Amino acid sequence: MVKRNGVFLGTKAGAMVAWLALSMPTVSLAVPPTVTGSLDNRYSDNVTQSAVDEVSDTESRINLSIDHQTDPGRCMASTNAQVGYGTWWDEAYDPELYADAAFFGDCEIRQGLNWELMDSLNQVLQNSRGTDTPDNRTLKNILRTGPRYTMFLGQRDQLSLSAQYQNTEFREPEETDSQRYIGSAAWNHIFDPTLSGGISVSMDRAELDTGGEIDTDVASLNWQKNWAVTQLSASIGYSKLTSRFGSFEQSSDGLVGQVALMRDVTGSLRFFLNASRELTDQTSDFDVRFGEFTFNLRQTSEVEVTALDVGADKSFSSGETLRLVFFANRADYLRVSQKEDSVGIDTVYTRPLGPLWNFDASVRYEYANYDEASENDNTLSVDTRATYSLTRDLSLSGRVGHNRRESDRLANEYEESWVSLGVSYQFR
């Protein structure tokens, strides 16, 4: 029987969120939040995703989700959160807490001066080379807050200053937590109604609970361009990262940049591209901004990261939708000069089967290379679901899926088939 010990996130971040939320002016709650509860039972013939000694078990999970956005006003806030608690019938694992939540709040203190509060809580893997099972997962909470001041220098120029505090905590005590202080300044010039650009500088000072420190400085050129059906924003710059652990000190530098492109090809087809290259550490929010990217928490903290997402969204007159995403990621762990690369494709298809029935399916393939051990992994996941609406608020669902991994290392291979039945209710 597989067991794991862990404690939930510390109270520092939660206490600060509560204090700041109470300190902000009241936000408008004219539109009530959407709250949904569900109960799912999932049977798997290989819950540990093992190459040998496969274990079958059924997990019962209670889920609660909330989605809310306030009306525009002096203070605005948006919340999207899903929380679940699962237990295993044959105790293959200890009871598990699941979470995927994001909160953003912005209050105008006075003209030009705003206070921002952001918090994200996500399930992440501890070892990127491991399997997506409870004994290889942890919760990562990132709280960021601070003031932002914007000043207009004439009709075409704008100066923005910000100072932020960020706290990152993991559920497992063996993972590295951090506190960081981020200061930034940016100047932007409007060249014409469709083109603007400028320069920005930022200083990031991270203090790790292991006693280490990581300083990251960035200077960039930024620009934004809009066409009739296309929006482009990009930056290119120079970054220097310095890490200190006791008497050890190491510096790395290089070119960094970001690109975000969106184009409405037709009224029913949209193309998008997002790419970024940064010098950062594992307690940053890079894996939140690029969901296909995974930090390896078993490696050293300092890392040069590169991520690319290219895809398209297509809708059909019959109500069908198709989303296709190609992704490529690289993590270069600087202190040990080890690289992890991954490329893959993720496809999601949805189709209404009638006034009460809906069907969706997803297929994900990923190829991963680990240069340290000269190993390659190929992972394929298939997930299909049918949903039946009993009433406007009550629905039933059934899912069938299959996961498979082939690897140069036989111990990393596995094959899993699973089936799930669930019921959900939307409270009003």
Across the structure, where does each feature detected by a protein language model lie?
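Cleavable N-terminal export/targeting peptides
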Residues: 1-34, 426-428
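Gram-negative and organellar
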Residues: 29-428
